[in-house]
Amino acid sequence: RPRTDWAVGTTIYPAGSLLAATYHEFLAGTAELSVVFEPDEHTSLEDYAWTRDHLVLVTLVDVASRVEVVTPGSWERAPIAGIPPKTNTVLVDVDEYGDEMFLDSSGFDFPSRLLWGLAGGEVTEIKSAPAFFDASDIEVTQNFVTSADGTMIPYFVVGHHGSAGPSK
């Protein structure tokens, strides 16, 4: 994962990309690099880990987590089912000898939850921190504001469902 743009021949891989190659070909200088992830103005790579058969990617899309499973070779990406939108989700651990993974997911309207699943399948909550308030009437919306230089800045508004106010 280059921290600065990386030129290989005539190809430039942007900083923050995740590249894959065959180990022996890479050492010999003959590898063809595959782009597994390439950042854009809305998305950055937060974390990644290998299970036995898959690569698990955690990206931030407009500051909200997206967790995907990548199949080696084709490098096709598929979202992991069972993770709510507008959350912060991190990899806790993966099984390098199997396809088990553990994630920690939390949001503005629910406490930290430990999730378990198999890469490529749906995740299941196995433990949760206690809730310190009733969030059944809480609504979370994501909005954007344009900065002076034209950059779209994401932000969240958290409030009671249907409430009116300066932020709505």
Positions of the model-derived regions?
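Non-catalytic accessory segments flanking enzyme active sites
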Residues: 1-3, 7, 18, 31-40, ...
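Short coil-to-beta strand junction motifs in C2/discoidin
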Residues: 11-15
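Short helix-loop-beta junction
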Residues: 21-27
